[in-house]
């Protein structure tokens, strides 16, 4: 089977994915212990960003690894209806067509959203396929499909029956542009420059005034108290008195509360319970009235004096300040830096707003969810995220689950004309249960928070409330892979809901990864113009197309110039096509536990070269083994060389390191171990060491067979070991190498084993670890490297065969020389190797050391004397520093007394070694000086 000369990912990736999907390789096998991962459902109409690609690579690596270990593997896929995000996209589309949702009406608007979902809902799933995600597409779910909608209604009704869902007036984050409550996650706190106004509030009895400070003067019209600290001596006598609230002309009490910081400002705080979260809590503690002064558009309503009604909040602020100033009640204005809450989608300032909403009472649900992590039923990786989880869970507010949107799960509650509320799975059930006959009913207009349905994700996708085979087999799931930013919004709620409805944890482990940032460590965002599209890494993109992508549809068009300039600087030639495998390997190499990762184009470039390296290694192996006797499935005699035994031994260590790292979610360590073994040991050394055996006349047929067998079997194991990281290139090569290594026939027979995906992941065999071979191979490599270094430093042409002398060697060195003379001569390009006894004198030479043994390259006619003096001087300087460091360490009583004896002894041995090497190099330097 001929392999293409060069590796071209675009020629193999998509066809392999289609092949795997059509063959059903992503489905659970039905054999082995179950292993299940639930994909965090991306927005149905969204597209894949670097964070998704990073997360999906981690999940796919785990899934492919466990599948190869024989587990009954399910990676459950699905998408989220993403209420607010999807509704906004469709509303923008309608605005472009000159209409809006209110003109269309609810039903027609929802038809439009479903239409939009059908049109663009496939983007993210197509992109997931491009990433190589081996999810079971036959089980794909959507948070608003019939089954999941049924589960949502079931959960709502059951929680309501138990009194755990209720309707009440509470303060929420209100988006005045979108006219809905939004979650904390959808609020961005932006640092902005503003003012702090200091006003005088007159005492009702006319005896003086208090000074209060605020950044939001317009809200003073809703004040219902002024608070001071109970221990503040300045105001002790005032507690219980009242203030005449200016402009509103009503009396409000002066109250004492620990919330007040007596050292901030005047130590007096205006309390507006209906428009500030902290004030709301103070208001509840003191039973204060809650006066909502805003409309849903954030204009002032009829609760304020007539002159302010209908003004928007910005106009109202100016009028309030002017009016108080005119009354002589404005004391001063300071510049002030403030954190302004803005809606992450609308960009407008969010209002704390008092409104009727549906809530989940979380206290009872939180207790078992805390216990599950405390007792180890659920473990966070890294463990420090458990503390973040606990701090949230122990300070939970009831969860506002209603949203004033049209797209989403409509709340299953109906109202009669008297305002009575009836909750049920559908209207029919409500009428029957409450004997309502044909009483007119209207359903609640609100929909549920998107996080409500996604909190049921692990069990609803497997068929709950029915008791299905899938639920019994795959629940609880094994691991959740998620970003830290949604531990509270999603992870905690999944744990609460799943424990409540299944008596099981949703997953046994939570692997928390960091954010993917740009090369400067900045968060990627459209407004910064630093977003990278994973598909552009795979397929490549021109500079012009990249600039166009980054500047199109900017919220702040003034940033276009700056973004263009930056893109020109970072990607002067656009982005090369690197292929999926190089992208995945880059993500994994950067995935150190829990930390944010800085994207590095140098890395992906390097890993594209790594793909080429593997490809070229496979071509070399194929050329030298195909059609030859590889000693597999035959009785022919096979003899292994030192290099063969060494690489087999090194493979066992690499397999163990990769498996242990994957088992502990250290994807960076696993990918590094695979890379080091494949590039440095197999490609750079073993392939070179195989050439003398395969191409030389000094070796027997049995030895040639041994090397051919080792070449193919180790390469085949490498492909299986690297497959979870790099699925496409490994499958392509395995189809050609597998049969040579005695594995399954190439694809096309329709057998389950016709793919590397279902081959066993290589397991380390301790019996194959050969320390003698490892010692010998390291010696051979060290001698070859030493000669090559001298060649490079002395500028000796590569083609020139050299004589070398070995001096001061031990018997073990002599034995290794005798056994490996051919390797050394061929790979170091030597014309002769002379062993010198202690009595023999050596010619003036360039010197390198392997242990205590000196490698001498005679200099006559070869060497640049000045360059060699400089080289040796540098080596000597380096060794002197090491001697000084070791001496300092051994003179330090803290080290000598406290370190284990073995560590101290090791340091002493190192010092002796450094001194011995130093003496030899100094002697050599003197020789050269007198040449």
UniProtKB/Swiss-Prot annotation:
Cite a single Pfam family from the UniProt record. Val_tRNA-synt_C
Does the keyword section mention Kinase?
Answer: no
Annotated GO biological processes are: valyl-tRNA aminoacylation
Gene Ontology cellular component terms for the protein in this record: cytosol
* Superkingdom assignment: Bacteria
Concerning CDD domains, the annotation shows:
Anticodon_Ia_Val, ValRS_core
Which InterPro entries is this protein grouped with? aa-tRNA-synth_I_CS, aa-tRNA-synth_Ia, Anticodon_Ia_Val, M/V/L/I-tRNA-synth_anticd-bd, Rossmann-like_a/b/a_fold, tRNA-bd_arm, tRNAsynth_Ia_anticodon-bd, Val-tRNA_synth_C_sf
Q: Where is this motif: 'KMSKS' region?
A: 523-527
Q: PANTHER family given for it?
A: VALINE--TRNA LIGASE, CHLOROPLASTIC_MITOCHONDRIAL 2, VALYL-TRNA SYNTHETASES
UniProt function note:
Catalyzes the attachment of valine to tRNA(Val). As ValRS can inadvertently accommodate and process structurally similar amino acids such as threonine, to avoid such errors, it has a 'posttransfer' editing activity that hydrolyzes mischarged Thr-tRNA(Val) in a tRNA-dependent manner.
The protein in question is named Valine--tRNA ligase
Species of origin reads Alcanivorax borkumensis (strain ATCC 700651 / DSM 11573 / NCIMB 13689 / SK2)
Its taxonomic placement starts with: Bacteria, Pseudomonadati, Pseudomonadota, Gammaproteobacteria, Oceanospirillales
